Swiss-Prot record:
PANTHER family listed in its UniProt record: UREASE (PTHR33569:SF1)
Any GO BP: urea catabolic process
Protein name per Swiss-Prot or TrEMBL: Urease subunit beta
EC category name: hydrolase
Pfam families: Urease_beta (PF00699)
NCBIfam families noted in UniProt: PRK13203.1, urease_beta
Family to which the UniProt record says this protein belongs: Belongs to the urease beta subunit family.
Record-linked SUPFAM superfamilies: Urease, beta-subunit (SSF51278)
Catalysis performed (reactions): urea + 2 H2O + H(+) = hydrogencarbonate + 2 NH4(+)
Length: 107
């Protein structure tokens, strides 16, 4: 194998199999583009993004790791979200949860 070389199997790779998903329309009401990364807790995205925020608690974009979705000013777009896996704790982002998703504080 050459350093940095990929050895990828033939066939389909299934991501987030058997995970709860949610599809919703998101509008950028701001005057600047907003980019959201693959593992960003969608509930805590920029307030200029308009959508049913409470429904997205515990979800992230259902896209490949390391990628992002860009929302242009005035743009409406449909996205699919996937439930966050693991121990369901969220730290950082905009600081709105800072712990367990079930019992986290929300203002």
């Amino acid at each position: 194998m050459i350093p940095g070389e990929y050895d990828i199997k033939d066939g389909e790779i299934t991501l987030n199999e058997n995970r709860k998903t949610l599809t919703l329309t998101v509008a950028n009401t701001g005057d600047r583009p907003i980019q959201v990364g693959s593992h960003y807790h969608f509930f805590e995205t920029n307030p200029a993004l308009s959508f049913s925020r409470d429904a997205t608690r515990g979800f992230r974009l259902n896209i490949a790791a390391g990628t992002a979705v860009r929302f242009e000013p005035g743009q409406d777009r449909e996205v699919e979200l996937v439930e966050i896996a693991g121990d369901k704790t969220v730290y950082g982002f905009r600081g709105e949860i800072m712990g367990e998703l079930e019992g986290g504080s929300h203002e």
